[in-house]
Amino acid sequence: MNPTASREAIRGGEFLIRKTLPEDTFSPEDFSEEQEMMLQACYEFAEQEIHPNVERMDSLEEGFMAGLLDKAGEMGLLSVTVPEEYGGLGMSFNTSMLIAEGIGGTGSFSTAHGAHTGIGTLPIQYYGNAEQKAKYLPKLASGEWKACYCLTEPDAGSDANSGKTKAVLNEAGTHYLITGQKMWISNAGF
């Protein structure tokens, strides 16, 4: 039995204001064999696919980063927390953090991976309606589609509360028009 299966996940900084018992504490010794195998797969992926090709990545070779994300998708590294019903692995937050650790030393790939799996996919997973989840999550989980994210605006910087850009439904009701300007879109280069 997985020792973490019966534990309740603590959200964000909740540990600061909630009584937490010692047995609720998670440590690396609590990882399952499956989680350890996933971590090893990350290390091998980095060693075989990324580290020997750092120059290609750093020189922004066209298609290289997207190709790495494709391979990560084939390995399941883009779908760790995505529910199984949408083509994901449906694994725990702890597992996703283990994956992040495993690819953390891969330079800009770790940023592209984090933008895809975190700020690009999680908002749909957490807040999307059923139709949005069914449309986007399977293709994001497989790597067929790449997620990107943009917060920064010329007059607001990265202050989300000062942003002015909006998506406004057109008069025909067929699509949205973006009003305003965004800058520095993570993962937009591919």
Predicted regions and their residues:
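Generic secondary-structure signature for well-ordered alpha-helical cores
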Residues: 43, 47, 51, 55, ...
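Mature N-terminal segment immediately following signal peptide/propeptide cleavage
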Residues: 29-51
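Intrinsic disorder at enzyme termini
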Residues: 1-34
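Glycine-rich, Trp-frequent "lid" loop and neighboring beta-strands that shape
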Residues: 88-89, 108, 131-190
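Buried hydrophobic positions in well-ordered alpha/beta secondary-structure cores of metabolic enzymes
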Residues: 35, 46, 76, 83, ...
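Short secondary-structure junction/hinge motifs that connect adjacent elements
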Residues: 53-73
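Internal helix-loop-helix
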Residues: 11, 74-134, 138-143, 187-190
